[in-house]
């Protein structure tokens, strides 16, 4: 093998374990893995998949969490909150995530890797009972909190 050939092979991900950065960019949490016992581990994997790249700024990830915090407060304070109201709030959050994804590629990568939009869509599943809708929405809120925590733990930007 000639000198140039070996160089181009490495660029294609051959030898030396391939291009791990591309593997991280392609990592996406599967919805079935986000459970009440595994959501913290999944959040850590998402943030690790963004290591070595520009993470979101702390301000950006906190603004995303602020959207979710309002829902979290409602869910914890109001036992009579209807499934329909929860679904409406999740739809609004989903729309705001889509908007932020359109504005900034780093947000789009984060939302995609964390599978946030599909998670929010799953709350709107017509087959769920009122109790299941509330439980799934609470799990979403906890998952978002875990993402923010690991973002900080792994050195999220303060810019």
PLM regions: where:
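Small/polar/charged residue-enriched interaction surfaces, especially the RNA/DNA-contacting tracks
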Residues: 1-159
């Amino acid at each position: 093998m000639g000198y140039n050939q070996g160089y181009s092979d490495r660029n294609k991900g051959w030898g030396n374990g391939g291009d791990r950065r591309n593997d991280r960019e392609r990592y996406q949490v599967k919805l079935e893995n986000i459970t009440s016992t595994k959501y913290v581990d999944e959040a850590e994997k998402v943030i690790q998949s963004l290591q070595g790249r520009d993470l979101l700024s702390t301000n950006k990830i906190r603004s995303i969490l602020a959207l979710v915090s309002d829902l979290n407060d409602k869910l914890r304070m109001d036992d009579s909150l209807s499934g329909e109201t929860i679904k409406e709030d999740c739809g609004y959050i989903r729309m705001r995530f889509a908007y932020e994804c359109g504005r900034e590629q780093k947000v789009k990568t984060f939302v995609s890797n964390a599978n946030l939009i599909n998670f929010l869509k799953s709350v709107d599943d017509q087959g769920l009972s009122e109790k299941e809708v509330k439980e799934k929405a609470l799990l979403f809120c906890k998952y978002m909190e875990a993402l923010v925590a690991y973002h900080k733990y792994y050195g999220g930007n303060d810019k």
